[in-house]
UniProtKB/Swiss-Prot annotation:
Function as written in the Swiss-Prot or TrEMBL entry: Required for vesicle-mediated transport. Catalyzes the fusion of transport vesicles within the Golgi cisternae. Is also required for transport from the endoplasmic reticulum to the Golgi stack. Seems to function as a fusion protein required for the delivery of cargo proteins to all compartments of the Golgi stack independent of vesicle origin. Involved in spikelet development. Regulates protein storage vacuole (PSV) morphology in endosperm cells. Forms a quaternary complex with the two glutelin zipcode RNA-binding proteins RBP-L and RBP-P, and the membrane trafficking factor RAB5A.
Family under the similarity heading: Belongs to the AAA ATPase family.
Tissue: Highly expressed in stems, inflorescences and immature seeds (at protein level). Expressed in leaves and mature seeds (at protein level).
Domain of life assignment: Eukaryota
Name of encoding gene: NSF
Catalytic activities: ATP + H2O = ADP + phosphate + H(+)
Alphabetical UniProt keywords: ATP-binding, Cytoplasm, ER-Golgi transport, Hydrolase, Magnesium, Metal-binding, Nucleotide-binding, Protein transport, Transport
GO cellular component labels: Golgi stack
Compartments, as annotated in UniProt: Cytoplasm
This protein's name: Vesicle-fusing ATPase
InterPro entries attached to this UniProt entry: AAA+_ATPase, AAA_lid_3, Asp_de-COase-like_dom_sf, ATPase_AAA_core, ATPase_AAA_CS, Cdc48_dom2, CDC48_domain_2-like_sf, CDC4_N-term_subdom
GO terms for biological process, alphabetical: Golgi to plasma membrane protein transport; intra-Golgi vesicle-mediated transport; mRNA transport; protein storage vacuole organization; SNARE complex disassembly
Binding site for ATP: R502, G503, M504, V505, D506, C507, A542, G543, S544, G545, K546, S547, A548, L549
Length: 743
């Protein structure tokens, strides 16, 4: 047979010929889907198949009423090939390839003439048998419209899908022979009044515009698992015919709640779900838009959202289209009933109205609500139970593979346009952008592009012509962008560095041992499956280096999420506000696979005062609960606490909730010697004497004394001392030390 040269499915043989278009000789012949030529012309087509125009293949038959050089087409064929009677059209012999039989054919049915107020049921099994017999071995092409008669009524079917044997969904769907083994799926055209019954051959595909999902083309990156869950929970049952769902005895899911941190793609996913669906355009409600100053108007606005779905269900029943309603920032209008004190009760009425529409006495079965929020805790509980917004999908921060997909999506166009430099390594960027949300990654790309564009602009002469061809976004641009765009969630490096302004110095065996123990706990969090929560308490005298040690463990852990909770960031907060802030840090930590939380100076967080004694029981109970709370599945957390009042923590039972407690000691003479040698501000001969005086000294106090002594007797010597030009006078150092009464 001839080779494939038209869309991969065979082609014309012997070149095309121009023929004059005529009308089909008789009305009964118009329902055969064949084209008619003269007896002389049909000899030019060995397979009796012709490619008419450039899109459709018709079976040819000879007819005496057709003159030589003419081809007779019915009205629908002429309309689809865009010709009129008397026009000329190119006709080529079509040679089908091997394996040209259709495995699956999806047809959309409608009346030839639109009929009002008429509902008719068509048996899918009987209709499929007749169509196979009537159009056997004819070529069916996607988009083709074919008239036919069934039980005395004329109909038209449109080919929505034509799938060959062994053909994958990802390959182009075009045409093939209708055989006796071809599965046929029938779909009624919208508002046609036709109802297909006894449809058992395959799942319905009319729910979606596309036959497959390519999330990257939709601009969705890193959310394939979440999208799969949404499809399984909310759409899988809707793909099957209604009679299958009725036999299963289940109801469709009517609501999805997308929740998670800002910028992770909740709104994007809801918008793209709406674009995927056939039929009605989604209604998008931006939270407070439904509110009105008039009494009862707010509830009416909610009812109006469901009006189209109600009318559709009344007229079409189970065949009605799916109506999607998207609520952005749903927490603004669906707060827990009784939580707002505005005196009007309008927020409670909104929740009540939604509940009755979704799952009331006359509940609709053709609606799907998609709500989005980053405050799931504010929503009314009744709205979240099965039958309402029952599918809860957390849209979390993307992992490394997800970040790579997002970066590829946002750099795809510049790569196609050759604006992306070859030295840009997206894999490396994905690895370096831990805890970046999708919106922040988009911000990184925009920032990198701004650097590239700025290089082409002369600030001295803004009228200078721009050279578009020389625009290149380089790896350096992305590195600069990473410094400019920082993640809202992640390691608070600046806060951690403030805990060790002088770096981390080797202070001897005791401190080195504690650091190694801390890194062992980090490793335990990484690999352990049985202990997702590890807690550690560092106790010791004030200034002994507890905070610096905890911060160093956090920085060296290379965890994506490291946060420090200290009293200095909550000055002026009420007790309840402090509790809320502490809870928020823990909740954010649960969003990362590995996280570290440092509770710095726990006694200060608890507002402890020795006289009394006095402390905040609310904050104490909050910490006790959170330190025992196991993180969600797949999330591991290390909590490091520091305190100078271990006796107080023992008295309130706080020490018992920590897995291990380590004592951070003051410096001994040999430890002080190491630190002084590292600082290199004393003469070698004076180091031992200075270290002897610093025995049992907290390291923070040591640094303070050295800095005071470095000023010199009359001041102004610090720059020379730290520059290595001078050394601290040992006698002046002892003089400074003698002024310190207590350390």
């Amino acid at each position: 047979m001839a080779g494939r040269n038209y869309h991969g499915y065979g082609g014309g043989g012997g070149g095309g010929m121009s023929m004059v278009v005529a009308s089909t000789p008789g009305q009964e012949l118009a329902l055969t889907n064949c084209a008619y030529v003269s007896s002389a012309d049909i000899r030019r087509f060995p397979n009796a198949l012709a490619l008419v125009g450039d899109a459709f293949v018709f079976t040819l038959r000879a007819h005496d009423a057709v003159s030589a050089g003419s081809i007779a087409l019915n009205a629908i064929q002429r309309r689809q090939t865009k010709v009129s009677a008397g026009d000329s059209i190119t006709v080529s012999s079509f040679a089908p390839p091997d394996d040209f039989k259709l495995a699956l054919l999806t047809l959309e049915l409608e009346y030839t003439k639109a009929r009002t107020n008429r509902n008719e049921e068509l048996d899918a099994v009987v209709l499929a048998q007749q169509l196979r017999r009537r159009f056997l071995d004819q070529v069916m092409t996607s988009g083709q419209r074919v008239p036919f008669e069934f039980c005395g009524t004329n109909y038209i079917f449109t080919v929505n899908q034509a799938l060959l044997d062994g053909q994958e969904n990802s390959t182009p769907l075009d045409r093939g022979f209708l055989s006796s083994d071809t599965y046929i799926i029938f779909e009624a055209a919208p508002n046609s009044g036709i109802k297909v019954v006894n449809q058992k051959e395959a799942a319905s595909s009319k729910l979606f515009k596309h036959k497959e999902f390519n999330l990257e083309k939709l601009g969705i990156g890193g959310l394939s698992a979440e999208f799969t869950d949404i499809f399984r929970r909310a759409f899988a049952s809707r793909v099957f015919p209604p009679h299958v769902v009725n036999k299963l005895g289940i109801k469709h899911v009517k609501g999805i709640l997308l929740y998670g941190p800002p910028g992770t793609g909740k709104t994007l996913m809801a918008r793209q779900i709406g674009k995927l669906l056939n039929g009605n355009e989604p209604k998008i409600v931006n939270g407070p838009e439904v509110l009105s100053k008039f009494v009862g108007e707010t509830e009416k606005n909610v009812r109006d959202l469901f009006a189209d779905a109600e009318n559709d269900q009344k007229t079409r029943g189970d065949q009605s289209d799916l109506h999607v309603i998207i609520f952005d920032e749903i927490d603004a209008i669906c707060k827990s009933r009784g939580s707002t004190r505005d005196g009007t009760g309008v927020h409670d009425s909104i929740v009540n109205q939604l509940l009755t529409k979704i799952d009331g006495v006359e509940a609709l079965n053709n609606v799907l609500l998609i709500g989005m929020t980053n405050r799931k805790d504010l929503l009314d509980e009744a709205l979240l139970r099965p039958g309402r917004l029952e599918v809860h999908i957390e849209i979390n921060l993307p992992d490394e593979n997800g970040r790579l997909q997002i970066l590829q999506i946002h750099t795809n166009k510049m790569k196609e346009s050759s604006f992306l430099s070859p030295n840009v390594n997206l894999q490396e960027l994905a690895a370096r952008t831990k805890n970046y949300s999708g919106a922040e990654l988009e911000g990184v790309v925009k920032s990198a592009v701004s650097y590239a564009l700025n290089r082409q602009i002369s600030m001295d002469d803004l009228t200078k012509p721009l050279d578009e061809e020389s625009i290149k976004v380089t790896m350096d641009d992305f590195v600069n962008a990473l410094h400019e765009i920082t993640p809202a969630f992640g390691a608070s490096t600046d806060d951690l560095e403030r805990c060790r302004l002088r770096g981390m110095v080797d202070c001897g065996k005791a401190h080195r041992h504690l650091y190694e123990r801390g890194m062992l706990l980090v490793e335990q969090v990484k690999v352990s499956k049985g202990s997702p929560l590890v807690t550690c308490l560092l106790e010791g005298p004030a200034g002994s280096g507890k905070s610096a040690l905890a911060a160093t463990v956090g920085i060296d852990s290379d965890f994506a999420y490291v946060k420090i909770i200290s009293a200095e960031t909550m000055i002026g907060f009420s007790e309840s506000s402090k509790c809320a802030q502490i809870c928020k840090v823990f909740e954010d930590a649960y969003k990362s696979q590995f996280g570290i939380i440092i509770l710095d100076d726990i006694e200060r967080l608890l507002e402890y005062v020795a006289i009394g004694p006095r402390f905040s029981n609310i904050i104490s109970q909050t910490l006790l609960v959170l330190l025992k709370r196991v993180p969600p599945k797949g999330k591991n957390l290390l909590v490091i606490g520091t305190t100078s009042e271990v006796g107080f923590l023992e008295s309130i039972g706080m020490c018992d909730v920590f897995s291990v407690t380590y004592h951070v000691p003051k410096l001994k003479k040999e430890d002080a010697t190491k630190v002084l040698r590292h600082l290199n501000v004393f003469d070698e001969a004076d180091i031992d004497a200075a270290a002897e005086a610093l025995d049992d000294m907290p390291i923070k106090k040591l640094y303070t004394l050295v800095e005071m002594a470095a000023q010199g007797p009359s001041g102004g010597s610090a720059e020379a001392v730290y520059g290595g030009e001078e050394k601290i006078d040992i006698n002046h150092f002892f003089s400074i030390l003698s002024d310190i009464i207590r350390y």
